[in-house]
Amino acid sequence: MQVWSAASGAPLPPDVRWALVHATVDAPYLPLLQRLGAAGVTVFGCTSFRGVFVPSGFERGAFALLGGSDDPVASSVRRNTDALGARSAARSAVADLRRGMPKPDVLLLYATPGFEERVLEGIHEGFDGAPPPLYGGSAADDDLSGRWRVIAGSEAISSGFVLVGFTSSRPVHGSFVAGYNPGTRRGRVTSASGRTLRAIDGRPAAEVYDEWLGGTLKELRATGGVVLSHTTMHPLGRAVDRVGAITRYVLTHPHRVERDGSLALFTDVAEGDELVLMVGSREALFDRTDQVAARAGRGAGAIRGGILVYCGGCVGVTGDATSQVSTRFGARIEHAPFLGAATFGEQGCFTGPSPTNRHGNLMADAILFE
């Protein structure tokens, strides 16, 4: 595997079989997709928030991780769909994928934001309730304006997903981490619909959440509005399972308070879910880069390449120091080539006795290939 920059002007290496492409929305990536497609390369990827993670740092532009004949085999399926059709589209995508690759070692998913859970449900059903471990992220742009795109072949999809299966003669590893700690505040969802959280413990959700945050949302609660700058360090966590003494959480990012007292979220929640106020720090967002690489690489041999997915909301916090994410990830995988995207949602597998693929926010996931 090797990382290749569209801006370098260098010729494509010989024997490229597949290309993972990450790009900022202002980069001229469509000619790159056409060039790769003309060479018979399987192409997949997404647009990324403010930059792309490459071994040299966090840079704007279009970049590709190229796989050759000695690397894992990749097969991809795309679907243009919306929320209503996403579940059935995912089932049909799996059926198409399995015709040429009955049981991938790992799945990579890139979707446009808004209906990731429906896609995961369809994938689960398509694999008869036992899908391979899945990792990936939700396409992003620079300002939540909807310019995000999923990359599939020579196409940039504004609503849909691309599902990639990898098979390899060598082990493939993955991990999915939160990097936030549970606090003492918690409550149970008593009214919710999809990504709208209306009530916690019988009270308006925005009122309860603001109380947990110490009143920082008081003015916005009166008018309604975007609260991302107030909530990135305090997402809502839902326990997935326990491994030994450790409870593992999937995170939900509240992004808006409504005048009716509800919270708009970037994931689904359900009535009966217990929510925990999670606590993060800027340094912890860097530390979890080490965690995601170390957990994926635990017991692994030499790494030949990797894929990193890191939440765009966290990039808003790490700011000018975001290149440290690339530096630390690269060091952990002993400077093997890798490519990463800053996304508006993350998908990953909680491995263990009962593996489960989930969609979350403010998280990080990785795939490492031996």
Region locations from a protein language model:
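Small-residue-enriched flexible segments
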Residues: 1-42, 46-319, 323-336, 341-370
